[in-house]
């Protein structure tokens, strides 16, 4: 399947009490309606294309690579060295790698069409005794302060490169950063860089990839190529809403299909029109509920709460049989064990604990010289991992106030001075007696969130606790 984040195509949801899930805070402006329609068209055109996309290949070497300054030797935190391009710092505006088709041009390579692309990168670390992390970003390498990080690639010590697949849209530009660098990056004209660095020698881009044709989505929407307008509408409506349309509503969508059919449009084009209309309709945008919830509506509410997605077959079967209405605890436990529950954990802790703001600024590297970029990234994940652990083990939420353990990975354990942890995964680590690291307010991420880039801020910290913990 194709994984793609559509939130960037829609206006942000209105926030009430720190969360964007309150129904009473929902607004539907003309701008939002147009955004839904535009997004619906974007989705339909890519789910039901008229022809199989052509898969192409592009090869890039050091001659095609550019950095924070074109031919940045002596000018920035990156430079070309024979057959390699070298990154030394973690701040993208001082050290990043992007690439162009023409070696003599600085026009950055642009993704030509929506789809899945495979990146095969030859790269290795230099003067490093441990694994490193490469960041893949969207954005113009000449304006890296606007980068959007879309994936981080851990590279084990001794690794010679990596292969990954990304879902990209037309117009996207790619750039690489050295996210685990020890320094933010600086001019190399006066003082050469002697620490760990990442060397890139070759990259191959292949895409858009099409595993099979027609695709799984096309077969699901159009199981046959001679569907009648009524069949087509019923099929798409069932896939989107999991419930039948009323006769009056169904009639309107059938008319759209018939109009397309009469105009001589292909079956794919007709299906696109119906899909766009349904995606932008209240039947899909709103979750309609009865004054007294039915079991099926309860299943939808539970699923969107714990999975941020529509219910699966097992949950709908439990609702249809009446089992969900009698006792939902079994289904709740099953759903929390499903990987999709990670969406709820991510979303809830991001908004409640403001994890996405931990790295908004700082720390000032002139003051905190030993804090590395990936350590700060780990700080932002600690609150999420503590919540996940308490939820999975059914532990008391009092651990957020005080605890005799912390959730840490290798970098955070090293930063806290705790026993060594192997790898990037977070595990519970027992705290020594009289340690003050237990609980949310002692987490490095929380302390950074409620500080400036160079000093603590007790007033800001106290205000945050009152608003988010005791409100």
Model-derived regions, located:
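Low-complexity, glycine/serine/threonine/alanine-rich intrinsically disordered linker
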Residues: 1-471
């Amino acid at each position: 399947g194709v994984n793609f984040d559509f939130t960037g195509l829609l206006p942000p949801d209105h926030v009430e009490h720190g969360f964007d899930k309150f129904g009473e805070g929902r607004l539907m402006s003309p701008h939002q309606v147009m955004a839904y329609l535009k997004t619906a068209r974007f989705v339909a055109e890519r789910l039901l294309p008229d022809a199989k996309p052509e898969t192409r290949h592009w090869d890039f070497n050091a001659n095609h690579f550019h950095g924070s300054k074109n031919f940045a030797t002596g000018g920035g935190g990156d430079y070309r060295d024979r057959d390699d391009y070298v990154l030394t710092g973690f701040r993208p505006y001082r050290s990043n790698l992007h690439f162009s088709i023409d070696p003599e041009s600085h026009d950055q390579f642009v993704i030509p069409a929506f789809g899945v692309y495979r990146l095969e990168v030859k790269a290795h670390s230099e003067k490093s005794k441990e694994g490193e992390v490469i960041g893949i970003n969207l954005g113009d390498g000449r304006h890296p302060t606007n980068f959007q990080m879309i994936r981080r690639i851990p590279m084990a010590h001794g690794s010679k490169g990596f292969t990954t697949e990304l879902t990209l849209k037309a117009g996207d530009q790619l750039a690489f950063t050295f996210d685990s660098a020890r320094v933010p990056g600086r001019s190399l004209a006066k003082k050469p860089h002697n620490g760990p660095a990442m060397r890139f020698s070759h990259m191959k881009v292949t895409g858009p990839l099409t595993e099979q044709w027609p695709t799984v989505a096309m077969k699901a929407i159009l199981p046959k190529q001679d569907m009648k307008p009524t069949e087509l509408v019923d099929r798409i409506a069932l896939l989107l809403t999991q419930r039948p349309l009323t006769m009056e509503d169904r009639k309107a969508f059938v008319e759209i299909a018939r109009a397309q059919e009469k105009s001589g449009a292909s079956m794919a084009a007709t299906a696109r029109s119906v899909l766009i209309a349904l995606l932008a309709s209240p039947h899909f945008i709103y979750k309609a509920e009865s004054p007294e919830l039915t079991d099926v509506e309860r299943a939808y509410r539970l699923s969107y709460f714990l999975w941020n997605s529509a219910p699966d077959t097992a949950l709908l079967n439990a609702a249809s049989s009446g089992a969900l209405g009698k006792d939902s605890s079994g289904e709740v436990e099953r759903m929390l064990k499903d990987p999709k529950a990670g969406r709820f954990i991510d979303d809830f802790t991001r908004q409640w604990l403001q994890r996405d703001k931990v790295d908004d600024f700082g720390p000032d590297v002139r003051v905190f010289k030993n804090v590395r970029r990936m350590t700060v990234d780990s700080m932002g994940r600690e609150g999420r991992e503590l919540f996940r652990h308490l939820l999975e083990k059914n532990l008391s939420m009092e651990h957020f106030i005080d605890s005799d353990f912390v959730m840490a990975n290798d970098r955070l354990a090293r930063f806290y001075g705790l026993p060594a942890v192997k790898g990037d995964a977070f595990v519970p680590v027992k705290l020594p007696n009289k340690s003050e690291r237990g609980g949310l307010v002692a987490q490095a991420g929380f302390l950074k969130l409620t500080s400036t880039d160079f000093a603590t801020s007790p007033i800001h910290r106290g205000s945050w606790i009152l608003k988010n913990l005791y409100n």
